[in-house]
Regions:
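Hydrophobic/aromatic-rich core segments of domains that either
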Residues: 235-313, 317-320
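A broad, low-specificity signal for short, low-complexity segments enriched in glycine/proline
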Residues: 42-47, 92, 212-215, 224-231
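N-terminal accessory/pre-domain segments preceding catalytic cores
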Residues: 2-188, 275-276, 311-320
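Short N-terminal helix-initiation segments at or just after the protein's N-terminus
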Residues: 71-75, 209-214, 234
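Active-site nucleophilic cysteine motif
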Residues: 192-196, 229-244
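Catalytic cysteine-centered active-site loop
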Residues: 211-212, 219, 230, 251-260
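Secondary-structure boundary elements
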Residues: 163-227, 276, 284-285, 290-296, ...
Length: 320
């Protein structure tokens, strides 16, 4: 009997220890459940819309310059995504090539007046070659200048915010003023993009005669396009790009193919979305591609909007 009492007492003690352990564990769980941890809400990136407009101005600051008797390259602002080149020789027809290792070679016409022109470093960081060529005859050229550059762009949007040879504007441009007018009262990027898009497709008409007669080397004059309210695809895209860039929205003027046609369109960077290729308008349900030429000349028919809405119809080659 005495032995039985001792065993019973031992079991009760063990039960007490186990029960106490359970009570301790449960108390710990309750304490953990009731403890407070501060978790901040995720911040939504906000668009800082400029008052009126904001135009970045390229400058040939002379800090980093390469030159010979034929050409001068100012590479002082490669970190901002652009270079400036001028020709100082005597030949009338000049070409510039800007190429990054492993990427497309960008070929431009260069004026022969001895003034700088701006060229974007569209392909991002890496090793570039900048070459200037003088025309001999026909399509034959001789190299007049060559320089390699190691580029490290600190502002990845720089190439698509600054004006350049293809998208040429300044603070006094009528296109910039119109962009500010269209964007007044709008607070977000989508609103700005939509306002500019709607204006262009509703007020510009496709210039068929110009499309049939345009020559190689043609560069859009965005203020002329705005005043005449007509143009080719290149004009549409350049005008919208200028307006959007002046509203601090990174915008690419893209040249490539739609089917077998050589064509131009634009892409924008939207905070919270990233680069939106060929898209400008959200109707509450679907994004619409950003190509303003087809939307305008097609009068926004169901068929043309379906074509524009299929990104597979677009093959980008160059971005300016």
């Amino acid at each position: 009997m005495e032995r039985t009492k001792k065993i019973t007492a031992a079991l009760l003690a063990a039960a007490t220890v186990i029960t106490s352990g359970q009570a301790f564990l449960m108390t710990g769980l309750v304490a953990q459940q009731n403890s407070r941890t501060t978790i901040e809400d995720t911040q939504v990136p906000l668009y800082s819309k400029p008052a009126g407009s904001h135009v970045l101005t390229p400058i040939a600051s002379g800090v980093t310059v390469y030159k010979n008797d034929k050409a001068t390259l100012d590479a002082s602002n490669t970190a901002s995504g652009y270079i400036m080149v001028k020709y100082t020789g005597s030949v009338g027809k000049i070409k510039v090539q800007v190429s990054k290792s492993g990427s497309e070679t960008y070929t431009y016409d260069l004026n022969s007046s001895g003034t700088y022109e701006v060229f974007p470093l569209s392909e991002g960081n890496g090793s570039y070659q900048v070459k200037v060529f003088e025309n001999i005859q026909g399509t034959q050229y001789s190299q007049a200048f060559s320089q390699s550059l190691d580029v490290n762009i600190t502002d990845t949007f720089g190439p698509f915010l600054y004006p350049n040879q293809y998208v040429n504007f300044n603070p006094a441009s009528a296109a910039v003023q119109k962009g500010a007018e269209l964007s007044s009262g709008v607070t977000d990027q989508i609103g700005v993009v939509t306002a500019i898009y709607n204006y262009v497709i509703n007020n510009l008409t496709y210039d068929t005669a110009k499309a049939q007669s345009v020559q190689s080397g043609y560069l859009p004059n965005v203020d002329v396009v705005l005043a005449q309210k007509k143009g080719i695809c290149f004009d549409y895209a350049a005008l919208m790009t200028a307006m959007l860039r002046s509203q601090d929205i990174p915008t690419k003027l893209v040249v490539g193919y739609t089917g077998s046609l050589y064509h131009a369109w634009i892409n924008v960077f939207l905070e919270g979305q990233g680069w939106v290729d060929n898209v400008i308008y959200f109707d509450g349900h679907d994004w619409k591609l950003m190509d303003p030429t087809f939307a305008s000349s097609g009068k926004q028919s169901k068929e043309i909007m379906q074509y524009i809405g299929n990104g597979g119809n677009y093959k980008a080659k160059y971005s300016y």
